[in-house]
């Protein structure tokens, strides 16, 4: 059995980091489903495919809350945290080989480190979601899970956009929260976007 692993939300400033793993012995069924990089699919299509993927594959999902990320980033980089999450998913699935979308600039280094941690064969590559259907499937599961978490957070805290710093709506809401002095727990406080906006808010006074 082979597995694919990918993440969603690595670069967002609001919401969790989600890592998903998909294991399957029949990749052809994934190909026939039309599984491809989640960013190239509409949200509705991702939801449909996620349901189909869960029927034919074993899936594992790991969510890291903003508070947990902030705590861990006191001593680690986001890529080190991701590596730990990937290792946990690999150990849960125990595949013969795991294909991983690499956040590391040197994918071979990530492959080696994950193999040392898990004792299993790992192939880490850039844009693995475009090459391996299993990684594309993991990308879809991760993105769908993140989107659901974001919707839950919006019900609680209001519409803050996508949660990514590049989104003007997200930045505007962050500014309002910072100015009010009440920043909700869904915000990643250690992100540079937050510290930059906090400084700008102070400078405006």
Curated annotation (Swiss-Prot):
Residues 1-203 form the RNase H type-2 domain. Changing residue 146 to A: Decrease of activity. Increases Km for RNA 26-fold. Substrate binds at residues 46, 143, 146, 164. Its EC number is 3.1.26.4. Pfam families: RNase_HII. Manganese or magnesium. Binds 1 divalent metal ion per monomer in the absence of substrate. May bind a second metal ion after substrate binding. GO terms for cellular component: cytoplasm; ribonuclease H2 complex. Endonuclease that specifically degrades the RNA of RNA-DNA hybrids. This is Ribonuclease HII. It comes from Archaeoglobus fulgidus (strain ATCC 49558 / DSM 4304 / JCM 9628 / NBRC 100126 / VC-16).
């Amino acid at each position: 059995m082979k597995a694919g692993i990918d993440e969603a939300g690595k670069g967002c400033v609001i919401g969790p980091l989600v890592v998903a793993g998909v294991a399957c012995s029949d990749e052809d069924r994934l190909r026939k489903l039309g599984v491809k990089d989640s960013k190239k699919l509409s949200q509705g299509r991702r939801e449909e495919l996620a349901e189909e993927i869960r029927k034919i594959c074993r899936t594992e999902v790991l969510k890291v809350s903003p508070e947990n990320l902030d705590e861990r980033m006191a001593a680690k980089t986001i890529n080190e945290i991701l590596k730990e999450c990937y290792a946990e998913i690999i150990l849960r699935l125990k595949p013969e080989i795991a294909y991983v979308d690499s956040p590391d600039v040197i994918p071979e280094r990530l492959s080696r480190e994950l193999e040392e941690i898990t004792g299993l064969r790992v192939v880490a590559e850039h844009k693995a979601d475009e090459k391996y259907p299993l990684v594309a499937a993991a990308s879809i599961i991760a993105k769908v899970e993140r989107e659901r978490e974001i919707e839950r957070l919006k019900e609680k805290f209001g519409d803050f956009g996508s949660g990514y710093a590049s989104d003007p709506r997200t930045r505007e809401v962050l500014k309002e929260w910072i100015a009010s002095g009440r920043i909700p727990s869904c915000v990643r406080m250690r992100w540079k976007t937050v510290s930059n906006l906090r400084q700008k808010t102070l400078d405006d006074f």
